[in-house]
Structure formats: structure tokens, C-alpha cells
Amino acid sequence: MVIKAQSPAGFAEEYIIESIWNNRFPPGTILPAERELSELIGVTRTTLREVLQRLARDGWLTIQHGKPTKVNNFWETSGLNILETLARLDHESVPQLIDNLLSVRTNISTIFIRTALRQHPDKAQEVLATAHEVADHADAFADLDYNIFRGLAFASGNPIYGLILNGMKGLYTRIGRHYFANPEARSLALGFYHKLSSLCEQGAHDQVYETVRRYGHDSGEIWHRMQKNLPGDLAIQGR
């Protein structure tokens, strides 16, 4: 186990998470007692207590007052906030994780983009207009793309879609910085934003579904060609 945390709390958090991932502390089992665990990791009990509370909030653990702390099946109890952690834990599964993330984005965005363009066209156009001034480099496009999808999610009038995009932000923007280094990807994205703006202006809401699905397919093809050179820094860095 190689841990690159920058603080005692970060080290303890990574130690426990990696131990859960590697089945040293399997789901459904009980964590060692606080004193034993703090000595094992090499941190104070106060620090350990803070870490356990944070991991419980993220769904890794269940703290039971007066009872031992239970290890959860994190797939069933955690949220989108652990995406970057999963990418760091299992590099071999990163391509599949990213495919799943992008598939979810496409599936839900067919709903909220159509709703935004139909019910709140002025807000939708305001979001899409931000593409007019984007600088032609990867970082700028990564931020733009995330903010356009997020902006349209909130423009739909259902803030839950926006919260889902919030949960994807970390890994989503890291992927974007790699993906948008490709000029073809930047060109495709600009065409997509322009098409959505035109559909909004025309009131052609029935074409949104196919437009979003087509963009998901075409951008997915570019992404798959680029996966051979996937950088190792997509995962979150140690705390």
C-alpha cells in the first residue's frame, strides 16, 4: 500500500479507504477498536475520530453509538463524491469508470437540456452564449463544458440535476482537461453548443434528444481513441 497523503488525517483517511477497497476491512465487518486502529495507523485518537466522522459522512462507514464502527458496502451507501477516490484506488478500472460517468451524463442531459430549452429558453441561451468567448485551450474548454452542462441542468428548473453535476465535477473536469487537449474535441463541442442554441431559438425542442445523443456518441468515439494515452493524474491527489 503506497499512500501519498500530506497530513496525518489525510494518511489515516487513505489508509482506511484503501484497506476497505483491498478487503483488509471488508464490507459488513467491524473496524478495529479506536485505540488499536490509531496505534496501527500512527495517528492520535482525536485525529482518527475526525477521520472516521468524515468517512461516515461519505458512506464508507457507519458509526453506531455505543457499538463498534461498521464497514459499509460503499457502492450502496456512498455518493458521487467518491468518484475521484475510486479512480485513484483502481487505475485499471478508470476507463470503465469514465465510460459509465459519460454515459450517465448523456442520459440525464437529454432530459434536462430539452426541459431547459423548452421552459427557460432565455436562461438556456445565456448559458450557451458563454461558449462565444472561450479561449482555445484544454483547461478553458474543460471548465466551459462543465459549466454549460451544469448551467443547463439548473436552467431546467429542477435543481437535483444540478446537484448531480456538482457531484461529478472533480473527475469530470480532470477528464475534460485531457479530452479537450484534442482540437477535434474542441471543434465538436463548439458545434454542439451552437446547435443547441439554434434549436432553442427555433423552438425545435423535439430535436434536442437526438442532438445530445449524437454528441455523446461522437465525443465518445474521440475519447476512446485517446484512452491509450490516459494520464495517471486523473485521480485525486493525497490530502
UniProtKB/Swiss-Prot annotation:
GO terms for cellular component: cytoplasm. Residues 34-53 bind DNA. Multifunctional regulator of fatty acid metabolism. Represses transcription of at least eight genes required for fatty acid transport and beta-oxidation including fadA, fadB, fadD, fadL and fadE. Activates transcription of at least three genes required for unsaturated fatty acid biosynthesis: fabA, fabB and iclR, the gene encoding the transcriptional regulator of the aceBAK operon encoding the glyoxylate shunt enzymes. Binding of FadR is specifically inhibited by long chain fatty acyl-CoA compounds. Keywords: Activator, Cytoplasm, DNA-binding, Fatty acid metabolism, Lipid metabolism, Repressor, Transcription, Transcription regulation. The keyword DNA-binding applies. It comes from Salmonella typhimurium (strain LT2 / SGSC1412 / ATCC 700720). One of its GO terms (molecular function) is DNA binding. The keyword DNA-binding applies. This is Fatty acid metabolism regulator protein. The gene is fadR. InterPro entries: FA-response_TF_FadR (IPR014178), FadR_C (IPR028374), TF_FadR/GntR_C (IPR008920), Tscrpt_reg_HTH_GntR (IPR000524), WH-like_DNA-bd_sf (IPR036388), WH_DNA-bd_sf (IPR036390). One of its GO terms (biological process) is fatty acid metabolic process.
